[in-house]
From Swiss-Prot:
Catalytic activity, reaction form: Release of the N-terminal residue from a tripeptide
Gene name for this UniProt entry: pepT
Keyword Protease attributed: yes
Record's cofactor remark: Binds 2 Zn(2+) ions per subunit.
Protein family (similarity comment): Belongs to the peptidase M20B family.
Cellular compartments per GO CC: cytosol
BP-aspect Gene Ontology terms: peptide catabolic process; proteolysis
Function field: Cleaves the N-terminal amino acid of tripeptides.
Name assigned to this protein: Peptidase T
């Protein structure tokens, strides 16, 4: 199993599938189409049926039941795309067998080193086989680790028919990293009662609470004149943006929050005297606090409009997804089975809220309750990203055990 995990994963990450927020196509990048087509062929080779890829790049497949019991149809999902935060082109995965727990020089020429001082969890992987980058790209374990694990688990179940299971549906979705993953997902065609998203992090991760999320685009309009004669004439749009940001609580930013704490995050700011644009994301687990944060944004805008004029600040704000807990609670047994599956494999479940987005959040509100399970990756979205193959193997075992338990309990 370990060899198959390494072979598939290292091959998959070399395909550039970064999504593109500025694109209006679906998927947003051709690499995702290329990858999807490859997976269609490999799913068929493994032995799955009803393998499809629609015009929007969504890949679906079926592992038929091998039991006569009336078992609910369950799904396993992962996403095709990788993050846009750092380059994902020309990924060169580096395999470190029997890792000694010490610092790893990723790139000697550029002096890029993965150190326990910077990443304290690193020594806990001593003895594992880990896969890192070469320091010049992200790795893409988010979410090609999860995708690989699903492929390997399906292959294992097909070759081990003594493990009884109901019908299993598999789906690989595009554009998750830019929040568009479920936009064209056909829940009815997928046909599962519920699903598990293989898109988590370290060993034991089991997540069924997510942020409530919104995005806010602010355009600040200034008046540019010659600075030598600017008195009482110039209005500096960049300073308006700075003023707006100054009204937000400093301590309620990502770098100062954890656990169940929400935040405002200035994702980008660019412009000049004439016009500046800022993009914020707003996050909170509590729906009332979430609405209060959006009201704070709106109130600051109103205050600045009263001070500088209606055209000085233009706000576009939209909700992105909601806390999936509300949709998971009525079918809590899907969490319980995943929890029990981990315990039976001597994995200690680590239940914590997702401080980020996952397709599962939106899918849960579309009628497909979808908690999130660990995949074995660390330090996603950057050059220090790595994955433990040993933990990936555990994730495969969890998928298999979940399928087995649903059949056993039917």
């Amino acid at each position: 199993m370990k060899e198959e995990l390494i072979e598939r994963f290292t091959r998959y990450v070399k395909i550039d599938t970064q999504s593109n927020e500025d694109s209006h196509t679906v998927p947003t990048t051709p690499g995702q189409i290329e990858f999807g087509k490859l997976l269609v062929e490999e799913l068929k080779e493994v032995g799955l049926t009803e393998v499809t890829m629609d015009d929007n790049g969504y890949v679906m497949a079926t592992l038929p039941a091998n039991t006569d019991k009336d078992v609910p149809v369950i799904g396993f999902l992962a996403h095709l795309d990788t993050a846009t935060d750092f380059t994902g082109k020309n990924v060169k995965p580096q395999i470190h067998e029997n890792f000694d727990g010490n610092a790893i020089t990723l790139n000697e020429e550029l002096n890029i080193v993965l150190t326990p001082e910077q990443f304290p969890e690193l020594p806990s992987y001593k003895g594992h086989t880990i896969i890192t980058t070469d320091g010049t790209t992200l790795l893409g374990a988010d979410d090609k680790a999860g995708l690989t694990e699903i492929m390997v688990a399906m292959n294992y179940l097909i070759h081990n028919p003594q493990i009884k299971h109901g019908k299993i549906r598999v789906a690989f979705t595009p554009d998750e990293e830019i929040g568009r993953g479920p936009a064209h997902f056909d829940v009815e065609a997928f046909g599962a009662s519920f699903a598990y998203m293989m898109d988590g992090g370290p060993l034991g991760g089991l997540e069924y609470e997510s942020f409530n999320a919104a995005g806010a685009k602010l355009t600040f309009n200034g008046t540019n004149t010659h600075p030598g004669t600017a008195k009482n004439k110039m209005r500096n749009a960049t300073k308006l943006a700075m003023e707006f940001n100054g009204h937000l609580p400093v301590e309620e930013a990502p770098e100062y929050t954890e656990g169940y704490e929400g935040f405002y995050h200035l994702l980008s700011l660019n412009g000049d005297v004439e016009q500046s644009k800022a993009y914020y994301i707003i996050r909170d687990f509590d729906r009332k606090n979430f609405e209060a944060r959006k009201n704070t944004i709106e109130n600051i805008v109103k205050q600045m409009q009263e001070k500088y004029g209606q055209d000085a600040v233009v706000l576009e704000m939209n909700d992105q997804y909601y806390n999936m807990l509300e949709k998971i609670e009525p079918v809590r047994e899907i969490v319980d089975i995943a929890y029990e599956a981990m315990k039976s494999l001597n994995i200690e479940p680590n239940i914590h809220p997702i401080r980020g987005g996952t397709d599962g959040s939106q899918l849960s509100y579309m009628g497909l309750p979808t908690p999130n399970i660990f995949t074995g990756g660390e330090n996603y979205h950057g050059k220090f990203e790595y994955v433990s193959v040993d933990v990936m193997e555990k994730a495969v075992q969890v998928i298999i055990e979940i399928a087995r338990r649903f059949e056993e309990q039917a």
